[in-house]
C-alpha cells in the first residue's frame, strides 16, 4: 500500500472516442490531481484526444493500444502497470475496460476497484460473430460488477434506479457528473457562422452521428421549424461525426434543408460553437448526464432536451420534451424562442453548487477513502 497520507488512483478507459465518458473521466482526473495527497494515472486503450488532454494536464498516461494488442496482452500490460505503480484503487469506465481492469487487478494486487456507468450502452453489434462477442463481454462485465468490483457509480439518480435492476443495490452510488465551469467559460470565442449571419436563429445538436443520438429526429424537427415559422432566417448546425453522416446528409436533402443545415464534423472549438447557438437540442433516445448539457448551461445557452436521465434535473420543465417526436421538439423550440427564458443565471448557479468538477472530485475521493478504510488526509 502507499503511504498513509498518499492515495494513488488508476483509471482504465478506452479513449477511442472523445465523448461523454472520456470527457467526464478527463474532468475527474484533472480535478483529483489538484487535491492534496492524491496521485492519479490513466491506462488508456487508444491514442487520441483523451490522451492528449491528460498529458497536457500532467496526468501520467500509459497507452495499451488495442489496435495492436489482444485482450491477453492488455491484461498483462495492466497487471505490470499495477505491480509497478501500486495503485490503492482501480477505477474503470465502459464495458470492456471494466472486464480487463478487473482481471488484471485480481492477478496483480487485488486492491479495491469500482466502475462508473455513464449511461446505457450505445453499441449495436451487427453480424453473428459481433453479437456473440458483445454478449460474452456483457456477461463478463456483469459478473465483474457483481463479484469483483466493490462499487458502481451512476451519474444520475434516474440511471441509479435503473441499475438497481442489474446490480446489487448496496453497490450503487450516485455521483453526478461535474463540469469545470471556469474552464468552459475560458473557451468562449467567436464562431464564424454567427459572425457571418448574426441575425439568423442558430439551432444546433452536438454528438456522435450514431443511431442513439437521433440526429434524424433533429433534422425532422428542423424541417418543422422551417414549415411553422417560415419568416425566420433559420440556420441549423450538426456538430460531430460518425457512421451515419452520409445517411443524414441524404435525409437533409430529402427534407429540403440543404441550404439551412451545416454538417461541421468534429470541432476543436466546440465550446465557442455552442456559445453561439440560440438553442441547443438534445434528442437522444437515452442519456446519463451529458457533459454537453452541463457545458451549455454553464455558457447560458438554452437547451431543449428529451426528458430522460439526468437532463430532467438540469433543464427547465418547459424545455423538456416528453413526446419524443419531431413535432414535440419543434414545438418546444418555438415556445422557448417566443417566450424567452430568464432561468440562465439561476441554472448556472445551480451547476456551480451541485455539478461542479470540484464537488464531483470530492465525492469520488470520499468513496475511494471509504473503500480502503481511510477517513483522514
What is each residue range found by the language model?
Residues 7, 11-76, 162, 174, ...:
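N-terminal strand-loop element at the rim of the active site
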Residues 266, 285:
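Aromatic "clamp/platform" in nucleotide-sugar-dependent glycosyltransferases that forms part
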